[in-house]
């Protein structure tokens, strides 16, 4: 009887040979794989909330934002979803998303507000535009006032006008590569009292340049410290006052400002 392999069985030497081949194939896969995968498998997820029953200019800006961020998502491998259903501002529906946007409104019910508070307190990310940050004595949401760095709406210019903006801090990931100043398209600018700059936890990133004053025609802001973009460092958040254009001038039409919008999403979305 000759010695050899028994039919239907694999001896130890063959096991070793197969193992070496598997490891070699895996090494080749790692060597030549370029790291590209579908966004649903790899990229972070963003959910944008917006409303269609608000001021027409707010709706137009939200529609421009949706197109801008869908294009940004396609180019940067993340998932961008959007909804007009603010009831989705709840713990279950927010769970898959690393970042949420409020494009032209804010939550109205206690349940939605409580869900947002929990989401942010547990590491969620937020970018709010224009009226998303609005608060005064009628909104009755003290947590949100603190979240905004203590900033309370005081007044605004009217009509929307373009303005020169100053980049206060170009070391932030949101403002990196921005010019020292740039012209922002027509917008309704909010003045806050107290100013968020007074809060030690707030990092002001962009401010209305004083050379714009007085700004407005019907409603005029004569002077003052007017932060436009800032972050509360206690949270993963950034607020941007842009969001109410007029006279056919679109918020998402300036390259420098668009860079700011893109940087903010990519910064907060990629934060762990």
Question: Where in this protein do the model-derived segments appear?
Answer:
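Catalytic beta-strand/loop cores that center a nucleophilic Ser/Cys/Thr
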Residues: 154-239
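Extracytoplasmic/secreted proteins, especially bacterial periplasmic and envelope-associated proteins
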Residues: 64, 68, 111, 115, ...
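Helical hinge/lid and interdomain linker segments adjacent to catalytic or ligand-binding clefts
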Residues: 40, 45-136, 249
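A glycine-rich, often tryptophan-bearing local segment used as a flexible ligand/cofactor-contacting loop or short
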Residues: 106-178
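Bacterial Sec-dependent signal peptides at the C-terminal "C-region" and cleavage site
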Residues: 32-42
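Bacterial N-terminal signal peptides
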Residues: 21-32
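N-terminal secretory signal peptides that target proteins for export/translocation
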Residues: 1-17
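Extracellular ligand-binding/catalytic regions of CAZymes and related secreted enzymes
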Residues: 40-45, 49, 68-71, 75-78, ...
């Amino acid at each position: 009887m000759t010695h050899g392999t028994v039919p239907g069985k694999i001896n130890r030497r063959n096991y070793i040979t197969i193992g070496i081949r598997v490891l070699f194939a895996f090494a080749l896969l790692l060597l030549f794989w370029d790291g590209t995968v579908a966004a649903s498998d790899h990229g972070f997820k963003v959910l944008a909330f917006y409303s269609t029953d608000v001021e027409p200019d707010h709706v137009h800006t939200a529609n421009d934002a949706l197109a801008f961020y869908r294009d940004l998502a396609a180019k940067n491998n993340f998932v961008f979803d959007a909804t007009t259903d603010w009831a989705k501002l709840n713990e279950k529906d927010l769970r898959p998303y690393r970042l949420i946007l409020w494009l032209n409104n804010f939550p109205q019910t206690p349940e939605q507000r409580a869900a947002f508070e929990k989401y942010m307190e547990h590491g969620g990310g937020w970018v709010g535009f224009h009226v998303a940050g609005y608060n005064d004595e009628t909104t009755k949401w003290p947590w949100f006032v603190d979240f905004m760095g203590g900033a309370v709406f005081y007044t605004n210019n009217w009509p929307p006008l373009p303005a020169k903006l100053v980049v206060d801090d170009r070391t932030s990931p949101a403002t990196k590569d921005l010019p020292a100043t740039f012209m922002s398209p027509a917008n309704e600018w909010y003045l806050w009292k107290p100013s968020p700059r007074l809060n030690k936890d707030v990092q002001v990133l962009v401010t209305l340049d004083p050379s714009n004053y007085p700004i407005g025609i019907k409603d005029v802001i004569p002077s003052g410290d007017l932060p436009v973009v800032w972050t509360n460092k206690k949270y993963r958040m950034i607020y941007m006052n842009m969001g109410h254009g007029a006279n056919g001038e679109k918020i998402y039409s300036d390259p420098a400002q668009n860079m700011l919008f893109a940087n903010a999403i990519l910064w907060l979305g990629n934060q762990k």
